[in-house]
């Protein structure tokens, strides 16, 4: 597999973060969490040892897609009757395993993200789950405040990612990656880049990088109380990729109205090589900020 310069730069920077980050921030876990920083939030101390932290967004949407990938699920006895409307939801949580592993502003953490596409309206087929993706991670994270111009690097994360759909052949899909995640802020802007390097067996989906590329880019902007977001992945050599746009607005203190549009390849593992456009509306518990 090929690896881009972003991954090489991030890997080379790991010793620098381990040695230097302690001098740049005065005990992040003794101060309020930095807005939008996953790592700074996880460094906050709580009395309850079982406290879980949000990692990616947590949401529930009613969605409709332009096209359904029935060919990929033709081994299911209900595939011909699958509906284009689905409930899509994401659960994403993290837990700090060891705060201060490489200095006050570092941690060893684990996260678990699950995305599901549920045929809730398909009562004639007992409302099956068409696809669920399971994504555990183990990572080293650093909260930083290094600045270049008006931009401040807030999170630096280096870890291992496994993603699979938990199915047996012929619908089994999975891959393993080493990754880095760098997040920077400038006022109401947030930019995050997550390059990866694929490792291990990809026989279930040998050409997955053709459609999913070698990185994910995420951009967020806070406009008043609303949050506008965009993220996507793209392979510059093949011209394939996918993008997700989102808008959220608070309904209550802890619940936000959320609209999402996904277009392109790779919305789920079963659809990694399938092009579609999906529109959804629902609620969200946490956004980028």
Swiss-Prot record:
Its transmembrane ranges are 53-65, 85-99, 106-118, 129-148, 151-164, 174-186, 189-198, 217-223, 226-234, 242-250, 256-265, 275-286
Q: Which ranges make up the Periplasmic topological domains here? A: 21-52, 100-105, 149-150, 187-188, 224-225, 251-255, 287-289
Assigned EC number: 3.1.1.32, 3.1.1.4
Name of the protein in its database record: Phospholipase A1
| Compartments it resides in | Cell outer membrane
Tell me which cofactor or cofactors this protein depends on.
Answer: Ca(2+)
The residues that the entry says bind Ca(2+) 2 are 167, 172
Please give the subunit comment from the record: Homodimer; dimerization is reversible, and the dimeric form is the active one.
Tell me the residue ranges located in the Extracellular compartment per UniProt. Answer: 66-84, 119-128, 165-173, 199-216, 235-241, 266-274
**Enzyme class per UniProt:** hydrolase
Binding locations of Ca(2+) 3: 204
Q: How does it sit in the membrane?
A: Multi-pass membrane protein
One biological process term in Gene Ontology: lipid catabolic process
Annotated family: Belongs to the phospholipase A1 family.
């Amino acid at each position: 597999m090929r690896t881009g310069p972003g991954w090489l730069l991030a890997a080379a920077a790991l010793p620098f973060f381990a040695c230097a980050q302690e001098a740049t921030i005065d005990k992040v876990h003794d101060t309020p969490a930095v807005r939008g920083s996953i790592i700074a939030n996880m460094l906050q101390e709580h009395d309850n040892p079982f406290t879980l932290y949000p990692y990616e967004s947590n949401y529930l949407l009613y969605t409709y897609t332009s096209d359904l990938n029935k060919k990929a699920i033709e081994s299911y006895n209900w595939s011909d009757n699958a509906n284009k409307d689905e409930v899509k939801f994401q659960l994403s949580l993290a837990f700090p395993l060891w705060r201060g592993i490489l200095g006050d502003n570092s941690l060893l953490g684990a996260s678990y993200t699950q995305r599901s596409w549920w045929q809730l309206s398909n009562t004639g087929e007992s409302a099956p789950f068409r696809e669920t993706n399971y994504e555990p991670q183990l990572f080293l994270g650093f909260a930083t405040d290094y600045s270049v111009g008006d931009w401040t690097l807030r999170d630096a994360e280096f870890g291992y990612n496994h993603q699979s759909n938990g199915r047996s052949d012929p619908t089994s899909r999975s891959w393993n990656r080493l990754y880095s995640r760098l997040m920077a802020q400038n006022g109401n802007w947030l930019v995050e880049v997550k390059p990866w390097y694929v490792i291990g067996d990809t026989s279930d989906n040998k050409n997955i990088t053709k459609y999913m590329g070698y990185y994910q880019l995420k951009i967020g902007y806070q406009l008043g109380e609303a949050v506008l977001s965009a993220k996507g992945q793209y392979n510059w050599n093949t011209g394939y990729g996918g993008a997700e746009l989102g808008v959220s607005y608070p309904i209550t203190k802890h619940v936000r109205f959320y609209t999402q549009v996904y277009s392109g390849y790779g919305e789920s593992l079963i659809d990694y090589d399938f092009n579609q456009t999906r529109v959804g509306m629902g609620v969200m518990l946490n956004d980028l900020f």
